[in-house]
Amino acid sequence: MSAEFDISDLKRRMQGAIATLKHELGGLRTGRATASLLEPVHVDAYGQSLPLNQVATISVAEARMLSVQVWDKGMVGPVDKAIRDSNLGLSPTVEGQILRIRIPELNEQRRKEMAKVAHKYAEEAKVAVRHVRRDGIDTLKKLLKDKAIGEDDEKRHAAEIQKVTDQFVGEVDQALAAKEKEIMQV
């Protein structure tokens, strides 16, 4: 009578929400130079929109300085424009095929704005984790209704799903706390 319920798919989907959150948080400016800061920048190149890292090498030159080595000399202008138009508040200095980007210190107001954005990303990740939990609970209810599992199994699996959900929500909170600390650090 007992069909087995596999929680590994739910864990994989919840892990995907955490990975997305970490990727989004990595793109938030903290006042320190990191190559991931320019990940959201796309350049209009060769008739299409390409990620910056597909037309240039991004490296950290100093604690507050990024260096962007453009591979094609004709792409320097479009790369410069893409970085300026990216809403990151960055202004590159062009030196031949290299763009130097000084990362200005964040003022208090900008730090608070970044923290709010980080909170928004974290809340979206929590919602995604809860959606996965709901899908798992719905699957359990369907299995119970179809008499594929008993009530005891349904309750046991529901408790297991809740435990995993709590674990992943905790991971979201940890990632948010670490990013907030990094953002607020002067």
Curated annotation (Swiss-Prot):
One record GO biological process: cytoplasmic translational termination
Alphabetized InterPro entries for the sequence: Ribosome_recyc_fac, Ribosome_recyc_fac_dom, RRF_sf
Disulphide-bridged cysteine pairs: none
A Pfam family assignment: RRF
UniProt entry keywords in alphabetical sequence: Cytoplasm, Protein biosynthesis
GO cellular component: cytosol
Signal sequence region: none
Subcellular location: Cytoplasm
Gene Ontology molecular function, alphabetical: ribosomal large subunit binding
Domain of life: Bacteria
Statement: the UniProt record of this protein carries the keyword Lyase: no
Keyword GTP-binding: no
Protein family according to the UniProt entry: Belongs to the RRF family.
Cited NCBIfam families: frr
Function (record text): Responsible for the release of ribosomes from messenger RNA at the termination of protein biosynthesis. May increase the efficiency of translation by recycling ribosomes from one round of translation to another.
PANTHER family referenced in this protein's UniProt entry, alphabetically: MITOCHONDRIAL RIBOSOME RECYCLING FACTOR PSEUDO 1 (PTHR20982:SF3), RIBOSOME RECYCLING FACTOR (PTHR20982)
HAMAP family registered for this protein in UniProt: RRF
Name this polypeptide is given: Ribosome-recycling factor
Organism of this sequence: Beijerinckia indica subsp. indica (strain ATCC 9039 / DSM 1715 / NCIMB 8712)
